[in-house]
Swiss-Prot record:
Catalytic activity field: (S)-2,3,4,5-tetrahydrodipicolinate + acetyl-CoA + H2O = L-2-acetamido-6-oxoheptanedioate + CoA
Classification via HAMAP family: DapH
Biochemical pathway: Amino-acid biosynthesis; L-lysine biosynthesis via DAP pathway; LL-2,6-diaminopimelate from (S)-tetrahydrodipicolinate (acetylase route): step 1/3
Disulphide bridges, residue numbers: none
Record-given protein name: 2,3,4,5-tetrahydropyridine-2,6-dicarboxylate N-acetyltransferase
Family: Belongs to the transferase hexapeptide repeat family. DapH subfamily.
Keyword flag Amino-acid biosynthesis: yes
Length: 236
């Protein structure tokens, strides 16, 4: 798995062309109206839909007010620096409502549930599940066959660029609403209890709980049974 350097991300954001994409439903005498070079138009007769940058489409609307009867604008961002990840070629299960930004790496057979938010530079390993409303901040790295519970937060580190990102090693279970602070590494096979706040590294094959989180025991057979990762949920 590849970890994106913080300065690469900062440079990407700085130099990216900021975008305010819109979808406009429009009605009027639309023939011959130029909505800008980047616009895509789907017009039949006197009605249509236009996709493009608001700056260009707004200028066209204002220049042709006498021809346009009505319009409605759909808009969900302003001067956005980072597009969303193109999901069509990802070999993973990604449910509606997940927000995944560009330059995120998602391993095969991963599962991203509704409402999860994954920021630029994050890595999700093969067979890992990111549950509902979990947040992976910038550059957070999760290994293979993990489960990041609902509402859990893995802190992001893009600024300052020298900060060490969160690293979750393979076969880790992070409980619901747990928080892993920047710079923390959670060792292979560990379990982080629900609601824990993890401020220091977690040794492999241990269970941590509490605020701040402390090791409460080593992984035993009972814990393994309660935290089993089901591959059936990861099949495509």
């Amino acid at each position: 798995m590849k970890m994106m350097d913080a300065n690469e991300i900062i440079s990407f954001i700085q130099n990216s062309k900021k975008s305010t994409p819109v979808k406009v439903y429009i009605k009027g005498d639309l023939e011959g109206i130029d909505f800008g070079s980047s616009a895509k138009t789907f017009i039949t007769g006197n009605v249509g839909v236009v996709f493009g940058e608001w700056q260009d489409i707004q200028a066209a609307i204002e220049a042709n007010q006498d021809k346009i009867e009505d319009y409605v604008v759909e808009n969900d961002r302003r001067n956005s620096a980072i597009p969303l990840l193109d999901l069509k070629g990802i070999k993973a299960r990604i449910e509606p409502g997940a927000i995944i930004r560009d330059h995120v790496e998602i391993g095969d057979n991963a599962v991203i549930m509704m409402g999860a938010v994954i920021n630029i530079g994050a890595v999700v390993g093969e067979g890992t599940m990111i549950d509902m409303n979990a947040v992976l901040g910038g550059r957070a790295t999760v290994g293979k066959n993990c489960h990041i519970g609902a509402g859990a937060v893995l802190a992001g580190v893009i600024e300052p660029p020298s900060a060490k990102p969160v690293v979750i090693e393979d076969d880790v279970l992070v409980g619901a609403n747990a928080v892993i602070l920047e710079g923390v590494t959670v060792g292979k096979g560990a379990v982080v209890a629900a609601g824990a706040v993890v401020v220091e590294d977690v040794p492999p094959y241990t269970v941590v709980a509490g605020v701040p989180a402390r090791v409460i025991k080593q992984i035993d057979e009972q814990t393994r049974a309660k935290t089993e990762i089901k591959q059936e949920l990861r099949q495509l």
